[in-house]
Swiss-Prot record:
Keyword match rRNA processing: no
Protein name as it appears in the record: Chaperonin GroEL
Keyword terms of this UniProt record: ATP-binding, Chaperone, Cytoplasm, Isomerase, Nucleotide-binding
Binding annotation for ATP: 29-32, 50, 86-90, 413, 495
Subcellular location: Cytoplasm
Assigned GO CC terms: cytoplasm
Recorded family membership: Belongs to the chaperonin (HSP60) family.
Taxonomic superkingdom: Bacteria
Annotated GO MF terms: ATP binding; ATP-dependent protein folding chaperone; isomerase activity; unfolded protein binding
E.C. number(s) listed in UniProt: 5.6.1.7
Length: 545
């Protein structure tokens, strides 16, 4: 296919035009007085959102060169959202400001490579300053404040997230689901829960709801399939002597082994239940080892030289409570706290080392099941449109709150970026080249843009307030919702440090790419044939008489 090629100024101008269009659509959502954006859907009612990344995801421009610029900026929003869960609009505003100021300098003949070096130098210093300025959050009230701001100043959502996090701990899993009612509620699952139910309904101890409930039970954790009851007899006899229930977890239990267990359960000779191992492949073995640590047992594996026939009662796991239904198993643990802590640290290390988002998510789930259980926030709303929008806000707020717990918080409302700009003013740049100094200055000016936009969305002129904040004492900022000068931290106007830092770093990364672009290539659109087309070809001899 033939290509269309733009060079130099033409390429950069077209890309910047696309960046500007996406930035203008996203920036109206910034701050407490940010406006809604209405997004048309081909089917059903339009989506209403105040979430920057949702707006960015929807934008595709007709001009292919402008669209390339817009897609680059979209990457800033999506990356910031993935890393920190919030700050997408701030990142978009910063990226456009740095790109716009940078391209002015490039147009006047300044070397873009030098400008980019200066930008990177300033951003590295700024990111370190944000890290140092962060205040650790520990209380439920502080967590609720962060979550409320990330949920577009919805204090009810903030309180629910703080409540969930308080219950399951910072390593616990919190999932968000759609409620079947109008109310937003939280449900908790203590201990370890996994999606494996009983292999036969005849194991049920409660015939009304067809579930199994054991107290003070033994757990046999076996790596392979069990087909013969002969293998199981020695361990069954040992458990029978203790008069305690037994849960068997194995890759599968089939044939006469399953039949004999069901028969013993129905007759009341032995309280027993059998389930399949959770997970698949390598993850299955890891999860069985987790269960062994959680219950103080041993994974029965031939690799370790243990067979079913030689299992001792001390090698079985123990649980305070076990609940099994047709879909799920829940084990409330009695394991050694020290061993559980060691296992948790090992999983945390694997999370840090993993490069796959999917693997990280699965490891995080395993960690939560070991240390804190699972909380489910069931989001309710009156209409389908409101439900989708609300669920999205809760998910964003949850990610941002995790970021706040991880790296701490800084004053919000764009005031931290102004303080960072003032800090950059004190840095000695005499050893930088002229081009690098220009890049350094671009970052200092661009750091004012988020606050300027927040104030503009509230209906005021940003420049006056930005000048004033530079003369006020540290920690003060402009509260755009009440139109007052306040101490940002004390007033609960805070942002996760990770959100602010990620927004700036991602913005500078993409802006630097735009500045150093010298050529843009895209496919030439083929003109569609609009002449009637269909039917049979006319015989040459059948022209008009």
């Amino acid at each position: 296919m033939a290509k269309d090629i733009y060079f130099n100024e033409d390429a950069r101008k077209s890309l910047l035009s696309g960046v500007e269009k996406l930035s203008n659509a996203v920036k109206v959502t910034l701050g407490p007085k940010g406006r809604n954006v209405l997004i048309d859907k081909k089917f059903g009612s339009p989506t209403v959102t105040k979430d920057g990344v949702s707006v960015a995801r929807e934008i595709e421009l007709e001009n292919p060169f402008e669209n390339m610029g817009a897609q680059l900026l979209k990457e800033v929003a999506i990356k910031t959202n993935d890393v920190a869960g919030d700050g997408t609009t701030t990142a978009t505003v910063l990226a456009y400001a740095i790109a716009r100021e940078g391209l002015k300098n490039v147009s006047s003949g300044i070397n873009p490579i030098g400008i980019k070096k200066g930008i990177d130098h300033a951003v590295n210093l700024a990111a370190e300053k944000i890290r140092q300025s962060a205040k650790k959050i520990t209380t439920k009230e502080e967590i609720a404040q962060v979550a409320s701001i990330s949920a577009n100043n919805d204090s009810y959502i903030g309180e629910k997230i703080a409540e969930a996090m308080d219950k399951v701990g910072k390593d616990g899993v919190i999932t968000v689901e759609e409620s079947k009612t109008f109310d937003t509620t939280i449900s908790y699952v203590e201990g370890m829960q996994f999606d494996r139910g009983y292999l036969s309904p005849y194991f049920s101890t409660n015939k009304e709801n067809m579930s199994v409930s054991f107290d003070d039970a033994f757990i046999l954790i076996y790596e392979k399939k069990i087909s013969s009851i002969k293998e199981l007899l020695p361990v069954l006899e040992k458990v029978l002597g203790t008069n305690k229930p037994l849960l068997i977890i194995a890759e599968d239990i089939e044939g006469d082994a399953l039949a004999a267990l069901v028969l013993n359960s129905v007759r009341g000779a032995l309280k027993v239940c059998a389930i399949k191992s959770p997970g698949f492949g390598d993850r299955r073995k890891a999860m069985l080892e987790d269960i062994a640590v959680l219950t103080g047992g041993v994974l029965i594996s031939e690799e370790l030289g243990i067979t079913l026939e030689t299992v001792e009662i001390e090698q079985l796991g123990q649980a305070k409570t076990i609940k099994v239904d047709k879909d799920n198993t829940t084990i409330i643990n009695t394991g050694n706290k020290e061993q559980i802590k060691e296992r948790s640290e090992l999983i945390k290390k694997q999370i840090e080392d993993s490069t796959s988002e999917y693997d990280k998510e699965k490891l995080q789930e395993r960690l939560a099941k070991l240390v804190g259980g699972v909380a489910v926030i069931n989001v309710g709303a009156v209409t389908e449109v409101e439900l989708k929008e609300k669920k999205h806000r809760v998910e964003d707020a949850l990610s941002a709150t995790r970021a706040a717990v991880e790296e701490g918080v800084v004053p919000g409302g764009g005031s931290t970026l102004i303080e960072v700009a003032m800090y950059l003013d004190t840095i000695d740049t005499s050893k930088l080249s002229y081009e690098e100094k220009q890049g350094f200055e671009i970052v200092k000016r661009s750091l004012e843009e988020p606050m300027r936009q927040i104030i503009s969305n509230a209906g005021f002129e940003g420049s006056i307030y930005i000048h004033q904040i530079k003369t006020e004492k540290k920690g003060l900022g402009f509260d755009a919702s009440s139109f007052k000068w306040v101490n940002m931290i004390e007033s609960g106007i805070i942002d996760p440090a990770k959100v602010t830092r990620s927004a700036l770093q991602n913005a500078a990364s993409i802006a630097g790419l735009l500045l150093t672009t010298e050529c843009a290539i895209t496919d030439i659109k083929e003109e569609k044939n609009t002449s009637g087309g269909g039917g049979y070809p006319m015989d040459p001899g059948m022209g008009m008489m």
